[in-house]
C-alpha cells in the first residue's frame, strides 16, 4: 500500500474478548486502504495461569507471556499493520482470559 496523500478518516476504537479455549482469535483485520495502530492490549487471567502470545499475520510480536491466575498484563508497545494483516491473540492454555485492545484505524478509501 502506498503512503496516503489524500483525505481520510482516523477513528479510535476498542474491542474486547472473553476467551477460554487454547486457540488463536482474530481480533482486528485491516482491510483495503486501512492502516491500524494498536495502542494498548490488556490481558486479565480470570481462570488458572495462562501463557499468551500476540501476532500480526503469522509473525509473533509477543510470545508465550506468562500471566498468573488473577493477574493482568498490559502491552503498551505500539504496533502498526496494513491491509491484509490480522492482529491476533493466542492462548496457550484453556483457561479464561479477558482481553481488551484499543487501536486507531486510518481509512484512506
Residue ranges: model-predicted function:
Residues 79-96:
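Noncatalytic modules at the cell exterior or secretory-pathway interfaces
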Residues 1-34, 40, 91-109:
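C-terminal interaction-tip segments
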Residues 65-72:
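Short proline/glycine- and polar residue-rich coil/turn motifs
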Residues 72-78:
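Exposed aromatic-hydrophobic patches
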Residues 47-65:
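Short, surface-exposed beta-strand/strand-loop-strand elements in extracellular ectodomains
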Residues 39-44, 87-89:
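Buried hydrophobic-core signal for structured, non-transmembrane domains
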Residues 64, 78-79:
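Short, surface-exposed secondary-structure edge patches
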